[in-house]
Structure formats: structure tokens, C-alpha cells
């Protein structure tokens, strides 16, 4: 009997999902991306060699795994080709291992132009997007005017549809944002030049996954970003434009919702956030800088330095609820090495003095919130690279146990370094 495992972030992204997916795919036949786009940055370190993936699933480096980009992903053809070329230059036969849904919306240059024009116009109120056209591409999808991978099968019809949509968006770019128009012919030529490469990888993803399920194959579904960036359940409007939560698996891949067996939530041992938006436990002091440097907290996609803070249990509990988490993988425990004390946010004090233990829904509700902390002893011992649970410092074990107690979810995997091997699997999701 096969197992279907979902791996997703429980915070604001950058929790370390890529490494965990890569590790667990040793037993998987398929790895599926079901939302987001090349705004994701999944870093893998295998035998000391670093690979950063933005669009292609993290199972691509394993020869026994088929990687799939599902319909919930917005696909930038140029970004995909660059990623494929880079991997192929290293000997990875991407075209033999990668499949696409024909329903993937395409991200094209006018989406990028709109994304950047809007951020510029917002000024101090900018959301902090990656500027890669993700939001505008999802807008076109919902408005039913977007172009999809499947449109590339008929190039004449594609050209007609593209002209209509370029004219539509150029009107907004030129007359509202006072920016330069996007060149229709240039966009058309660039896309058609690689159209046959993309269409050659197209498959009926829902049918494929259902057949795999019936055969008993193990499948993994790889989330991007994190729960608190979900378009519906995140800190709106400082969110991404897709459903980053477990509910997005069914809609973004075509797998029936009853066929998810285990949901693994990746939780970093502290909190980080890129871009604007609420962050109650943010540390703008020496400890915050310590976490940033020790954790190398700089975005794999944008290179921006990440905001850092203590682990927010209140926010993580919201992720537990929304995703019906089966277990946690705690990452970057080693970054806390050397701190005399560590803190967990266990509640919020509202501006009117009330104490609450749930997160607000919209960004406005987070204004003026103060974190309520529980302080625990830190540890001086080095946990980096430790591969045996019994060899972790007692204070670190106490920290992990307290997270389990406060969330009601077991920590099934512990990561103590970036390499695939620097991991303790206490309970394998495929065996749970």
C-alpha cells in the first residue's frame, strides 16, 4: 500500500523544506509541486554540493524519482529553461525526470512588469514581493484570461490570445503606471522558441497520480512558501497569491483529498520573514543579528536579508489547525547553539491589555501586539551535524519537547545542518 506525504512550511517560508523533500524522496516514486512559482527558493546540499531550485521539484536529483509541476503552479518558461539548463550542465537528465500539467498558467514578461510597477507605486506600503510576476499571473488565471502551458500546442491560437492580453496589460502599464509597454513580438518569439520543449513534458497529472496511487507508489507533495503566507489564511495582504496550506494539494495537483496520508510541517527552531508584514517576535537587536548570521538568513531567491525572531508557537498552532499536521520536522536547531537562553512565544498581549492565544486573521489585527514569552535555558554544546537523538544536549531536548507540548504535534524529524545526512528521522512519514 502506497503512502502520500505532504511537506509544507508552518511559518513565513524559508523553513528548510527543500532539504527535507530531497531526503525523504529516497522512498518516493513521484514528487509534486502544487502551488507557487519561481518565487520559491529550495536549497539542497548533497555531499557538500549546493543546489538551489526555484521551480523544479526537489526530487529532481534522484534518478528513481519523477518530478511533476502541477496545475496549481504558475510557470515562467524562461525561469524553467534556465533551471533545466543549469541542471543538465551538471549531468542531471531533467527532461527524462520532469513532467508538467498542461493547466499550469504561464508567467510572461508583462506579469513581471506589472508586479514591479505596482510595488513601485505602493512606495512605503509595498508588500515586498519577489518581483517575479507571481501575483499578476494568478490574477489572470482567476480572471480566466491567462495563457496556460496547454495553449502552446496551437501556436497560431496562442499568438492571437497573447496579442489580446498584451494589449490589455500594456494599457494599464502605460496609462496608469506610466511605465514602458511590453513588446508583444519579443514575448511571442521567446515563448514559441521553447514551446516544443515544454509541450513534450506535458502529461495528464491527475490521471497519472491516480494510477500511481492504485499501484501503491509512494508520492510526495512539496509546498512552497509557508502557511502564514497563504492567500486565505495568512497575514493578508502581506501574503503570496496561492494556497500554501495542505488544502492546496488537491486543487493544485488533482489528487483526491482523501488520499493524503501524512502532513509534515517544517518548523524552523526560530522565526524568519522576508518582506513586509506582521512579525510579533521580531528581534532588532544583537540576538536577531546572531540568528541571521548563524542561520545564513539571506533569501535563496532574492538575496534579501531575512527578518529574524523567536519561535512563535501561537502562529505555529494556527498552522497545525489549518493543515491537520501529522508531525513536525524541526530545522536549524543548531543555529540556537551558544545562546544562554531561548524563548518561545506562547501568547499575545493585545493593545487593550487582553491576552490571547490565537492569531488575528488580517494584518490590521496584528498591529500593536506584544509577544508573551516563556524563557528556557539555552545550551553551549554544538548540535551542528549531530545525527543521534541521544547525543543532543538536554536543554535542546527540553526545547523540542516543549514545542511538542505546546502544539500537540510530535517532532518526527530533526535537522542539524544543511546536508542531506545531517538529519535525525525519529519517525519516517512513509511508515507513520
UniProtKB/Swiss-Prot annotation:
UniProt protein name: Adenylosuccinate synthetase
Catalytic activity line of the entry: IMP + L-aspartate + GTP = N(6)-(1,2-dicarboxyethyl)-AMP + GDP + phosphate + 2 H(+)
Primary enzyme class: ligase
Record-annotated active site: 14 (proton acceptor), 42 (proton donor)
Enzyme Commission number: 6.3.4.4
PANTHER family: ADENYLOSUCCINATE SYNTHETASE
One BP term from GO: 'de novo' AMP biosynthetic process
Compartments where located: Cytoplasm
Family: Belongs to the adenylosuccinate synthetase family.
GO terms for MF: adenylosuccinate synthase activity; GTP binding; magnesium ion binding
Stored SMART domains: Adenylsucc_synt
Residues noted as binding IMP in the record, renumbered to the chain: 14-17, 39-42, 130, 144, 225, 240, 304
Job description of the protein: Plays an important role in the de novo pathway of purine nucleotide biosynthesis. Catalyzes the first committed step in the biosynthesis of AMP from IMP.
Positions with a binding annotation for GTP: 13-19, 41-43, 306, 332-334, 415-417
Pathway it works in: Purine metabolism; AMP biosynthesis via de novo pathway; AMP from IMP: step 1/2
Annotated positions binding substrate: 300-306
UniProt cross-references to InterPro entries, sorted A to Z: Adenylosuccin_syn_GTP-bd, Adenylosuccin_syn_Lys_AS, Adenylosuccinate_synth_dom1, Adenylosuccinate_synth_dom2, Adenylosuccinate_synth_dom3, Adenylosuccinate_synthetase, P-loop_NTPase
Oligomer and partners: Homodimer.
Binding residue positions for Mg(2+): 14, 41
Keywords for this protein: Cytoplasm, GTP-binding, Ligase, Magnesium, Metal-binding, Nucleotide-binding, Purine biosynthesis
Recorded GO CC terms: cytoplasm
Cofactor: Mg(2+)
Note describing how the cofactor binds: Binds 1 Mg(2+) ion per subunit.
Short name of one Pfam family: Adenylsucc_synt
